[in-house]
UniProtKB/Swiss-Prot annotation:
This is Threonylcarbamoyl-AMP synthase. The gene is tsaC. The lineage of its organism: Bacteria, Pseudomonadati, Pseudomonadota, Gammaproteobacteria, Alteromonadales. Pfam families: Sua5_yciO_yrdC (PF01300). GO terms for cellular component: cytoplasm. PROSITE patterns: YRDC. Required for the formation of a threonylcarbamoyl group on adenosine at position 37 (t(6)A37) in tRNAs that read codons beginning with adenine. Catalyzes the conversion of L-threonine, HCO(3)(-)/CO(2) and ATP to give threonylcarbamoyl-AMP (TC-AMP) as the acyladenylate intermediate, with the release of diphosphate. It comes from Psychromonas ingrahamii (strain DSM 17664 / CCUG 51855 / 37).
Length: 191
């Protein structure tokens, strides 16, 4: 069964994303925290919410590879590397790829690369398609704690924290482990 947000729920999420807000949403394996990747104020809210240092960087999650081109420089990859990446998308595989030169350090951290994924989760795809760009994706948890697997766990973890504006009440896709991360240039699995 394809699970999608009602139009009113989608509109609420878009309104928050467009106004420097933070949403919590289901992904393939855990709940994620997301915001507009072009809004540094919103990214700062996520870092504060998670108590995560900026040097680590964040993931961008999208509905298509085209949505990621503003942030990731796929032209620096070989045709073979790009073919391997495209075979894994949409899906639960995140790739570390060269970043565009102007990418915010709040996204790339201390790296010249960016972590990107084209998701297969229908709700995240719906949000990214309607938003017409990717969103930040980082696990919904305080740094060093287990990631939330449900909207109830997100609400409990972040109770009255006003930095989190919306928790989407829908299930994760059911992967029992976090999504895998690979480095595009080496093919090495990092997680």
């Amino acid at each position: 069964m394809l699970l999608l947000l009602k139009q009113s729920e989608l509109n609420d999420a878009l309104k928050i994303l467009k106004s420097q807000g933070v949403i919590a949403y289901p992904t393939e394996s855990v709940f994620g925290l997301g915001c507009d990747p072009d809004c540094e104020a919103a990214i700062q809210k996520i870092l504060l919410l998670k108590q995560r240092p900026a040097y680590k960087g964040l993931i961008l999650i999208a509905a298509s590879i085209e949505q990621l081109e503003k942030y990731a420089d796929f032209s620096l990859l070989t045709a073979a590397q790009l073919t391997v990446i495209k075979k894994t998308w949409p899906g639960p595989i995140t790739w570390i790829v060269p970043s565009q030169k102007n990418l915010s350090k709040l996204i790339s951290g201390d790296f010249e690369s960016v972590a990107v994924r084209v998701t297969a989760h229908p709700i995240v795809r719906q949000i990214c398609l309607a938003f017409d760009k990717p969103i930040i994706s980082t696990s919904a948890n305080l740094s060093s704690l287990e990631a939330a697997l449900s909207s109830q766990q997100v609400n409990k973890m972040f109770k009255s924290n006003t930095l989190l504006n919306l928790v989407i009440d829908a299930p994760v896709s059911g992967l029992s482990t976090p999504t895998q991360i690979f480095h595009a240039s080496t093919g090495k699995r990092l997680r």
